[in-house]
Amino acid sequence: MTSHLPYRIDLAGTWIDQPYVSRYGAGWALTVSIEPTIEFMERGGMSTSTRNAAKKIWPYELPNYNEEMMARLLFCFENDPERDGHISGAQDAIGICMSGLNRHFYDNHFWPERIESYHDEETLSWLESHLCLVEMFPRRKGCSVVAGMDITPEKVRALTSAADRCWQAIMERDLNGFAAAFSDSFNAQIAMFPAMMAEGVEEHISRWKPQSLAHKMSGAGGGGYLVLVIDGPVPEGAIPVKIRRKDSF
């Protein structure tokens, strides 16, 4: 039986869910929960490791239950600092379990101080009509996206400012503002984590740049999927996005 568990797309503020980033400045991460219209590849920035952990609790679909509670449960289930020493960012569990558009505020802790959910149908329809995904390649074994990281207060401010502007542009359905903030958020990410731009990524970006207003890599980068902001039909070869609505069980 096929699993109907959602995936997530991180729109802006990626990496702020790690305390070693938010210690330099608090801010929001923005995610949307998306329907599993295809089975996305592993090591592709689509939170498949967190989704695989979720399958151990809910093999086929999420229960009709408090979404934030499920996200907290999944986050705690996946992460064992005594054993692993590495904590997956909370944005993955939140992005999978919490429907619609969400932003979560991080301030030097693994779990956000607060979460805001948005379910306006016209806005979600607008947002998904301007997003699509394109496949690149799985993040290669041995690839460390944190190698050479350079985190400074100024770079974190650039990230958090972009996330603030991205949210506001979505609320106003301002496509150009959304694309600009989306791009600024990605640029802030790679300024702190240059190893996200693994060999071969730039070629894919160059290929799709003429067909998009903005782009970013999903998740931690190093490969995976490009998320494109578009103005018009989904380009041939790209994957449409379907945002999961509340109570769509």
Summary of predicted features, one role per range:
Residues 1-12, 16-23, 27-52, 58-87, ...:
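C-terminal nucleotide
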